[in-house]
A protein has these predicted regions:
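Extracellular glycoside hydrolase catalytic/binding regions
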Residues: 1-135, 157
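Aromatic-rich peripheral "rim/lid" segments of glycoside hydrolase catalytic domains that contact
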Residues: 117-178
């Protein structure tokens, strides 16, 4: 990534760059590889990773994976009784990276399939949003709009946001449009 960052900074010195680790942007790879040791580039003005306020760390969080990616209906608490621990652990690790390197962190992908009872999806999204807010982690949900065949998409062209209004409110703080 260092060569890419140097090239971009030549023409766009203040462009926001979001950099994640390898292997699906797991937080453990953010904290291991998005560091001055691995991003050891030096720009023409002598600055580098540590000096760049417009370089953010990126990670994905899919805990519990059986719930977020599972194709069968699951009770998030019964089937994954310690699911919150994995979420909090990832958030804490990302936040520690942010504080150590004085950089913002962005959870660029999180979410779950909508084949579960909606109350479980609502509980999951409410918890995730609250945990990110505690640490000022920027985020985007995967995914709000896609197509009617995608099991993660919140919006359906035939019935809008019907059935997921509580999830949309958790994510946006507002009732979904009609």
């Amino acid at each position: 990534y260092g060569d890419c960052i140097q090239t971009i900074r030549t023409s766009n010195p203040t462009r926001l760059l979001a950099v994640g680790g390898p292997h699906y942007n797991g937080v453990e790879f953010l904290t291991k590889y998005v560091t001055p040791e691995y991003l050891s580039y030096t720009l023409k003005d002598g600055t580098g990773f540590a000096d760049d306020p417009n370089l953010w760390g990126v990670f994905h969080c899919y805990h519990p994976r059986g719930f977020t990616h599972g194709a069968i209906d699951q009770d998030i608490n019964k089937d994954h009784p310690h699911w919150r621990d994995g979420v909090v652990s990832d958030m804490e690790e990302a936040n520690a990276w942010s504080e150590k390197h004085h950089k913002r962190v962005y959870l660029s992908e999180w979410g779950c399939r909508l084949n579960h009872e909606i109350r479980h999806v609502e509980e999951y999204t409410a918890f995730m949003v609250a945990e990110m807010a505690k640490r000022a982690i920027e985020w985007s949900y995967y995914c709000g709009l896609f197509n009617n065949a995608w099991p993660y998409g919140l919006y359906n062209s035939e019935w809008g946001f019907e059935g997921v209004k509580g999830v949309v409110k958790n994510l946006t703080g507002q009732e979904p449009p009609k």
